Amino acid sequence: MVKNTIEESVATGRRKQAVSSVRLRPGTGKIDVNGKAFEEYFPLEIQRVTILSPLMKVLGTTNECDLIIRINGGGIQGQVIATRLGLARALLKKNVDSKQELKSHGFLTRDPRKKERKKYGHKKARKSFQFSKR
């Protein structure tokens, strides 16, 4: 196995069914998501700001490193939060001193909530069938 000479860090983030792998390496600020441009994959500004918030808090800029992101499963919002967690973990691997700052903003917390399973005798997880007295 050949070792990379470029100093990069890889981390994984998860949220619900979404799994995101983030590769952080020194560069010019290019962001690639599943082979597409960052703005093309995440068209809303709020999504892009949410994803890049750990980078802005630690480095203060997005132009110092390149990101290669691979996402599988889940919906758009789950993918956004999974990617943010992956980016925060990658930053932590690269810069251990930033742990307190990342933790105080809640970027290192994995949201444990998942979809509750459907129960038999019910329409959904908690919703019952209509009750008829007679």
From Swiss-Prot:
HAMAP family membership: Ribosomal_uS9_B (MF_00532_B)
Upper lineage: Bacteria, Pseudomonadati, Chlamydiota, Chlamydiia, Chlamydiales
Biased composition regions of type Basic and acidic residues, renumbered to the chain: 98-114
The organism of origin for this protein: Chlamydia caviae (strain ATCC VR-813 / DSM 19441 / 03DC25 / GPIC)
GO molecular function, one term: RNA binding
Domain of life according to the entry: Bacteria
Region (Disordered): 98-134
Full protein name: Small ribosomal subunit protein uS9
GO BP annotation list: translation
